């Protein structure tokens, strides 16, 4: 895919890997929607890159819909890069007792459920795209981690969330390939 002129959403784009991804896409000529919960940083980056900002908690359906609508208003949505995520270090049983279930669920909800939320909403928009001359309608990229295969002590929640990303990518890719939308995961 020629990135120049294409519209991409990058989640978690106000900092870290997401910010680096947004900067790389913009440097290649993409129009980038910075989708993040960090409004001040996200708005500043969007201004700097000539893109747009969408206040987006990836776990919230309405926020995801708004980010996709923002992207579609800029042109044909051709890419989603899921970088939003959190990591906590907490042993299954530590000196203060059992791993907090709420913390485990929070990591799964943001890293895995949030990624799926954005994939399904972006894919819906991409399915409506007229194919590019190459036949493509878009690309869906989710950030996994080596922790999906080799998580360390204290990384149960993070490793499970990234294992989920790896596990859901192939079935999504198989289905999306029928309409020429690519789905991939990779180590961040």
Model regions and ranges:
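Canonical Rossmann dinucleotide-binding motif of NAD(H)/NADP(H)-dependent dehydrogenases/reductases
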Residues: 2-33, 172
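Conserved mid-core segment of classical short-chain dehydrogenase/reductases
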Residues: 76, 87-105, 124, 128-136, ...
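Catalytic Tyr-X3-Lys loop
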Residues: 78, 86, 97-117, 140-141, ...
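Alpha-helical segment proximal to the catalytic Tyr-Lys
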Residues: 124, 174-178
């Amino acid at each position: 895919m020629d990135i120049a002129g294409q519209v991409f959403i990058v989640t978690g784009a106000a900092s870290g890997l997401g910010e680096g991804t947004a900067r790389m896409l913009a440097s290649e000529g993409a129009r980038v929607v910075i989708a993040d919960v960090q409004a001040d940083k996200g708005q500043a980056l969007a201004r700097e890159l000539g893109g747009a900002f969408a206040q987006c908690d990836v776990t919230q359906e309405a926020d995801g819909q708004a980010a996709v609508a923002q992207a579609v208003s800029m042109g044909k949505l051709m890419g989603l890069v899921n970088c939003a995520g959190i990591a906590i270090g907490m042993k299954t049983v530590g000196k203060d007792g059992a791993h907090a279930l709420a913390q485990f669920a929070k990591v799964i909800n943001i890293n895995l459920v949030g990624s799926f939320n954005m994939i399904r909403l972006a894919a819906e928009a991409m399915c409506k795209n007229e194919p590019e001359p190459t036949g493509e309608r878009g690309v869906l990229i989710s950030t996994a981690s080596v922790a999906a295969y080799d998580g360390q002590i204290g990384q149960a929640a993070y490793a499970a969330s990234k294992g989920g990303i790896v596990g859901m990518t192939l079935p999504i890719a198989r289905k999306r390939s029928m309409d020429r939308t690519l789905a991939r995961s990779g180590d961040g």
